């Protein structure tokens, strides 16, 4: 289902690429991003179901440079949610999140893509104490291999901006859900509507360079500034 726009904008993309389209956030953004582009290209290794007339399904393994290069052809901008989404053993994280991130940015460079929205995580700063309020300018302190891989992705995005001019917004996503389900979630909650607003603003803001932000709603209590 195509949702109506929450973010009024005159910018309309010809073709957007959404990786990780079969995941929980990918499924949520699939209907929401459709109204901001003519064609929404969806990619994942898992089943993405049937496609609507405005959609293209392009399965690809992030660790396979040729497959990633193919899904990048003709794309105007990328929302990169793909990869291993939680703590795992080293090898799948290495292949999907580190090699995969490199393949994605290299393909973006080759195809002239100028904007990437990179799904990072609060786990890149997971070893700060909960009584410390932190911001995106503070040094990373990953709490595991997953957080480490996303810290690499943020630095990779910095390299590709400094060296090639590809702009990125790296969103350290908190706890996205329709509503908070625990007291702990109240400090990290990101509503689905705010997720849409954040991603669309990251895609359409006139100049973002290399930006790292925390993705969280305007909650009464939060760990992040």
Q: What feature does the model see in each segment?
A:
Residues 95, 129-168:
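Catalytic helix-loop patch of NAD(P)-dependent Rossmann-fold dehydrogenases
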